[in-house]
Amino acid sequence: DVEIFAVGVKDAVRSELEAIATPPTATHVYTVEDFDAFQRISFELTQSIWLRIEQELKSIKVKSLTPPRDLSFAEVTSSSFRVSWSPAAEDAIAYLVNYTVALGGEEFVVSVPAPTTSTVLTNLFPKTTYEVRVVAEYPEGESPPLKGEETTLEVRGAPRNLRVTDETTDSFKVGWTPAPGNVLRYRIAYRPVAGGERKEVTVQGNERATTLYNLFPDTKYHVSGVPEYQSGPGTALNGNGATEEVVGEPKNLRVSEPTTSTAMRLTWDKAPGKVQRYLRNLHSRSAGGDIKEVTVKGDTSTTVLKELDPGTAYTLSVNPLYASGAGTAVTGEGATLQERGSPRDLIIKDITDTTIGTSWTAAPGMVRGYRIAWQSLFDDKTGENHVPGDTTNTVLRNLDPETKYRLSVYANYASGEGDPLSGEATTEASPDGKIVKISEETETTMKATWQPAPGNVLNYRVVYRPRAGGRQIVAKVPPAVTSTVLRRLTPLTTYDISVIPVYKEGDGKTRQGSGTTLSPFNAPRSIKTSEPTRSTFRVTWEPAPGEVKGYKITFHPEGDDGYLGEMMVGPYDSTVVLEELRARTSYKVNVFGVFDDGQSPPLIGHETTTLRDAPRSPIPSSGLDCTTKAQADIVLLVDGSWSIGRPNFKIVRNFISRVVEVFDIGSDRVQIAVSQYSGDPRTEWQLNTHKTKKSLMDAVANLPYKGGNTNTGSALKFILENNFRPGVGMREKARKIAILLTDGKSQDDIVAPSKRYADEGIELYAVGIKNADENELKEIASDPDELYMYNVADFSLLTNIVNDLTENVCNSVKGPGGLNPPSNLVTSEPTPRSFRVTWVPPSQSVERFKVEYYPVAGGRPQEVYVRGTQTTTVLVGLKPETEYYVNVYSVEGNEISEPLAGTETTLPIPSVRNMNLYDIGTTTMRVKW
């Protein structure tokens, strides 16, 4: 072989040099920048070449020395083996045995002097492969090595300390101390010492115990445990164990064949195991009773107990006896028989439709209980009750109504039942069965219906007569029929009706009822109660058919007829508010139609008052101030009928306050009178009564509630004759206005009085609430209806019309000759902060104009005044890009016109335009725009 050193100069590629040179490249490849640099590597290159020459000379010399031969291994154990070889040349001084784990690890050396050619390597790891090299030593050096490998055996041994624990009759637990080494499994063998089948189980090598099952009881076993290794079995560990004897208890102890005097038979199921004898104990349960013990053979399971006391209870036990001792006893009870008797004096009481109560005098002797049997005499239904021996009464339940039963009471003894005590009883009719139901009433007939009676009914006898007295009528009805029509009755009369089932043996339970024939007068319909408060609620109904003359309403707390309230309303009224009621109380309401010859049956309703009144929000002020020099006489005609009620009348007062508060009250301005009407109208105050607004507002706040029927026509006539006249404050040149507030249909004519208002030049406003008749309101109000007629569905909705009504009444006060507003509003010249407002003045001259403006989105109104000859102005100081309301008023003295209204929006702030940069330097420039 040729060993190559590679030297690269200047641009030589090192990877090519490494491919050419002999490994290792660290000592065989060199590079220099140019030829002048050879001096730098010459010493290192020369030294490497000389070192390799010395190594080759030494290798040649070693190869000339004779190595040992025929390496072999013997006596292999888990921690040692013997190494042997054939000798080398005669001049060998000694042998070096080098060994190490084949997978890597520390190397060990043993020197063996020549001519010995064998040695034992010790302290080795079990089941481990070792690499062994044997070198012969000569004076000139060491020979080449003789190499080989050997593997130690795995550790094998025996487990120790065999233990047997947890013995039962068919198992015990075997435990041991583990065997050394890597045990794969343990094989546990066992067989009875006295001989028998050998069995074995296998457990994992990491287990330290196992339980042997299905063993023979009371048997000694020989047990051995052998560890198994990968290389084979280890040494066995032997020992002995034994199961326990089977010990138990007999089962199902039974007493049979008791007699009245001396004996009873005792039987049981045998106890498990080898029972030698049974110990039988007998103990009287009475105080001071002796204990008797007798033994019988172990193969016996029955015995007769003799010489016992009659009528006596005994505690019994049977205990198995084994060679190892006593087992567990089974216990029971038994009793000899005693003489039997019967209860006496059967009493039947507390009978209802489904129950019968019974009691009796106790039977003699040791009674364990009573059985009470019952059987229907009408059908095959039967049943029974059971009570303890110290109880002498019971209630039979779930019986059929109106049924005859035979009852039997049996005394129950340990030896059986005595003779029965018997009797008979009949249940009452059921609550529904006692009742005759009345339906389909007319003026002269009614239908009677009842539940069928049980059993073999021959017929039903129907008896009826007027409750107030009169001739009794009797009818017979077939047994299959349970209803009949009673005829030839008197109208509006209450009858008492009885229905008696008739049997062959006699009469059954009577059914009773009552009914009233109809009135010839029809009742109102569809009653409805609503709007409950702490002391009031509303009652509404649909009118009764026919020529009704009015309605009577009675009411009282539920269950308290003594507190009966009553009121009358007219034929056109269909609603009323009941007042002065108790808080949180349920009331019954009756509404009768009243006719010339009598009244109808009642229409009945129910309602419950509340614990407290719900808060009501007052009607807000309109905010209007009716400023005018005009004079006006206003009369308010207020409906105070029962259909309004006090809570709603408070709302009416609040509504009147909101209407009248806008006017300037005085003898030279506006005067207001109020009249209230129902059945008969009355003046609350005249036009000239209140000279100031404060006095008027106080009077409105204290306006009393009148109550009564709704007679609107006579009320309109009343204020024409009593309020619109000079003697009570009416002024000839003042404008005359009437305002009607009503919640119902008028009971009298309204056409003629309404026409008189138009004829006399009085403007008439009509405000209807809730139940008002809209056609009637249009007939009453002045034209047009859009200005003079209002109708709302509820009192709480008056707040929705107060502003419009107040404004229209104010315009009526001002009259057609009032101050006219300007016209033709034009806005122009808008900027971000201003715009111009222009208008056309009214036909008459005015002192000045008021211009009011404020943002549409909300804000405080601002105003400016200009002379009456000026018809334009610029509003300044505004917000950019904002929409404004604008109102322009004509002003003359203290009088102000209606507004001329419009809107305008300011412009947004404009952005910069035409920006130019010039005179630009290194740190400055000029900007213009």
Swiss-Prot record:
It is found in: Secreted, Extracellular space, Extracellular matrix. Keywords: Cell adhesion, Collagen, Disulfide bond, Extracellular matrix, Glycoprotein, Proteoglycan, Repeat, Secreted. CDD domains: FN3 (cd00063), vWA_collagen_alphaI-XII-like (cd01482). SUPFAM superfamilies: Fibronectin type III, vWA-like. The triple-helical tail is stabilized by disulfide bonds at each end. Prolines at the third position of the tripeptide repeating unit (G-X-Y) are hydroxylated in some or all of the chains. GO terms for cellular component: collagen trimer; extracellular region. GO terms for biological process: cell adhesion. Glycans are attached at residues 98, 231, 324, 415. PANTHER family: FIBRONECTIN TYPE-III DOMAIN-CONTAINING PROTEIN, TENASCIN. Belongs to the fibril-associated collagens with interrupted helices (FACIT) family. Trimer of identical chains each containing 190 kDa of non-triple-helical sequences. This is Collagen alpha-1(XII) chain. It comes from Notophthalmus viridescens.
